[in-house]
């Protein structure tokens, strides 16, 4: 890609997301979302492969459909209330449509099926952008309108996202698809308390980004595409695989790693709100994802069953150095639990 085009696209993505966090007008919010979508399409289709083109088309159609629904709901609310302010959206039907549209943008269940195929069709770093940065804008809008959002709708989507994220990842061998289902499950945890305790949801999203970024950077460094590729890396770089294993366990929410903090706070908040059934179902559904993380850890840090290698092992011909930022993020994914806030 031309360096000037790359600069314009990345600047547009960064500025559109930043402007959404600071605007209070629905038309401005919609315009920023459209700029963000149009800027992501060239990045997704950059590999110049039929799968990348298919992924870019799917992403564009889903995001445009969600933005159009949100604009329709905002217009309906403006006709009935004579205001375009995001935090003054009072029409129940408009609020519900906006919530569903934002759930579609975040790939929350039941609107999650597009994310794995889009993630598999593009590069590892572009997938990282879709799973982290692209969730900031819809999450910001949800946080702005959280006091008007239907709590039942949010909780149902959260429980369904955690369940579908775990079930979908059970039979996956491709790492990008597996991480996409992991993102769907984490989206459920982020949304679980967004109406009752938005600060906990913000903390959950922050921890999610801190665990996802080093995982993707390490996968990109080793150029692993499947779970089998991870198993062949152990003899070449045991330090990298050890750090990757700990980061994956942190994503699973195992104590005493940092990933345990948000789940602990969310379950504690739900129980304090007398939502014991919902908390129990979410905790049980998260065991599906935990099984997948344990399988990944076993494959990446211990052993592979005897097999014939039918593809060239990439680590034989490449030796990449790990940037300092990756090391710092991996340490944060393991050591932040003692700093848990009292929420």
Curated annotation (Swiss-Prot):
<comment type="similarity">
    <text>Belongs to the complex I subunit 2 family.</text>
</comment>
<feature type="transmembrane region" description="Helical">
    <location>
        <begin position="150"/>
        <end position="170"/>
    </location>
</feature>
<feature type="transmembrane region" description="Helical">
    <location>
        <begin position="178"/>
        <end position="198"/>
    </location>
</feature>
<protein>
    <recommendedName>
        <fullName>NADH-ubiquinone oxidoreductase chain 2</fullName>
        <ecNumber>7.1.1.2</ecNumber>
    </recommendedName>
</protein>
<feature type="transmembrane region" description="Helical">
    <location>
        <begin position="200"/>
        <end position="220"/>
    </location>
</feature>
<keyword id="KW-1278">Translocase</keyword>
<dbReference type="GO" id="GO:0005743">
    <property type="term" value="C:mitochondrial inner membrane"/>
</dbReference>
<keyword id="KW-0813">Transport</keyword>
<keyword id="KW-0249">Electron transport</keyword>
<keyword id="KW-0812">Transmembrane</keyword>
<feature type="transmembrane region" description="Helical">
    <location>
        <begin position="270"/>
        <end position="290"/>
    </location>
</feature>
<keyword id="KW-0520">NAD</keyword>
<feature type="transmembrane region" description="Helical">
    <location>
        <begin position="96"/>
        <end position="116"/>
    </location>
</feature>
<keyword id="KW-0472">Membrane</keyword>
<dbReference type="InterPro" id="IPR003917">
    <property type="entry name" value="NADH_UbQ_OxRdtase_chain2"/>
</dbReference>
<comment type="function">
    <text>Core subunit of the mitochondrial membrane respiratory chain NADH dehydrogenase (Complex I) that is believed to belong to the minimal assembly required for catalysis. Complex I functions in the transfer of electrons from NADH to the respiratory chain. The immediate electron acceptor for the enzyme is believed to be ubiquinone.</text>
</comment>
<dbReference type="GO" id="GO:0006120">
    <property type="term" value="P:mitochondrial electron transport, NADH to ubiquinone"/>
</dbReference>
<dbReference type="InterPro" id="IPR001750">
    <property type="entry name" value="ND/Mrp_TM"/>
</dbReference>
<dbReference type="Pfam" id="PF06444">
    <property type="entry name" value="NADH_dehy_S2_C"/>
</dbReference>
<keyword id="KW-0679">Respiratory chain</keyword>
<feature type="transmembrane region" description="Helical">
    <location>
        <begin position="59"/>
        <end position="81"/>
    </location>
</feature>
<keyword id="KW-0830">Ubiquinone</keyword>
<dbReference type="GO" id="GO:0008137">
    <property type="term" value="F:NADH dehydrogenase (ubiquinone) activity"/>
</dbReference>
<dbReference type="InterPro" id="IPR050175">
    <property type="entry name" value="Complex_I_Subunit_2"/>
</dbReference>
<keyword id="KW-0999">Mitochondrion inner membrane</keyword>
<keyword id="KW-0496">Mitochondrion</keyword>
<feature type="transmembrane region" description="Helical">
    <location>
        <begin position="241"/>
        <end position="261"/>
    </location>
</feature>
<keyword id="KW-1133">Transmembrane helix</keyword>
<feature type="transmembrane region" description="Helical">
    <location>
        <begin position="1"/>
        <end position="21"/>
    </location>
</feature>
<dbReference type="InterPro" id="IPR010933">
    <property type="entry name" value="NADH_DH_su2_C"/>
</dbReference>
<dbReference type="Pfam" id="PF00361">
    <property type="entry name" value="Proton_antipo_M"/>
</dbReference>
